[in-house]
Amino acid sequence: MAEKSTLAASSALHLSFPPAASGVFHSRSITAVKVHPVALFSILDHYLRRDVSQPRVIGTLLGTRSESEVEVRNAFAVPHGESQDPWQIHLDAEHHRRMLDLHLRVRPDEVVLGWYSTNTELNSNSALIQDHYSRETAPHQAIHLTLNTNVADEANGLGVQCYVSALLGAMAKPEDCAFLSLPTHLLMSTPEQTALRHLAAPKPQNITDLDALKASLEDVQAKLDRVLTYVRRVLAGEVEGDKAVGRYLSDTIGVVPAGLDESLLESLFQSHLQDVFMVSYLSKLVSAQAEMSTRLVLLT
């Protein structure tokens, strides 16, 4: 599929970006890449299910693109094979196309952004794969995301890094390219942060609804204590106040209706607590009825 990479000697280094279509921002204007945890979990799941003889797994990145940033929201695996003597790569293009069609039926707002690899090494095969995905993302450049799966690497851990590519030389071959690093950030919503915190718990265990509510209240209380400590330190002049934090606190406090006394607030909380218990009771009742119905069917 490809010849061995050869670089001609020259006194100058030419970085050639493919020309962009008129009116379309080029990837050189990208300032950052934001990655959602869902995409990283998909990549790790693919890696754990790989053939042990594979040095790495690859797949397609999906998400949204703006003028200056790309947001990686999803990913799916693409079967492949590769060799180093000579440098060759084989991708299951039909599998890629079928998976992409299925995904776009559910999320038509997402586009192909590039590809991922679970090996941080960038070689000639990486350049060939990058060239393939560049055709998928044209006129934009393809994003290449690498995920370090070496858990023994305490310095970097599961390091995530994104790149774009630039051809070397005026008449360069697809495999003759340089990968240029981009700022990469992990983007998490509040529900995702909560889910990740529970996944990172050392000893997950089954807890009752009341225990879960108690843990949530204790977490809220701890956060309120942190906020009060910060505000008191700012008022005392111990630390310099952050305007962004002040605006956020003001907006948060503004959500609470004004004029609520302690008795009314407690009454509202008790009402909400009763609703929680009622929902929990009804869900257990439905579960018990379903189990009973299943056993009766087996008896008949």
Curated annotation (Swiss-Prot):
Q: Which domain of life is it from?
A: Eukaryota
Q: Which UniProt keywords apply?
A: Cytoplasm, Initiation factor, Protein biosynthesis
Molecular functions per Gene Ontology: metallopeptidase activity; translation initiation factor activity; translation initiation factor binding
A cellular component term (GO) from this record?
Answer: eukaryotic 43S preinitiation complex
Per its UniProt record, what PROSITE patterns does this chain match?
Answer: MPN
List the InterPro entries hit by this protein, alphabetically.
eIF3f (IPR027531), EIF3F/CSN6-like_C (IPR024969), JAMM/MPN+_dom (IPR000555), MPN (IPR037518)
Instruction: Give yes or no: UniProt keyword GTP-binding.
Output: no
**What name is this protein filed under?**
Eukaryotic translation initiation factor 3 subunit F
Query: Which source organism does the UniProt entry give?
Result: Malassezia globosa (strain ATCC MYA-4612 / CBS 7966) (Dandruff-associated fungus)
Q: What is the lineage of its organism?
A: Eukaryota, Fungi, Dikarya, Basidiomycota, Ustilaginomycotina
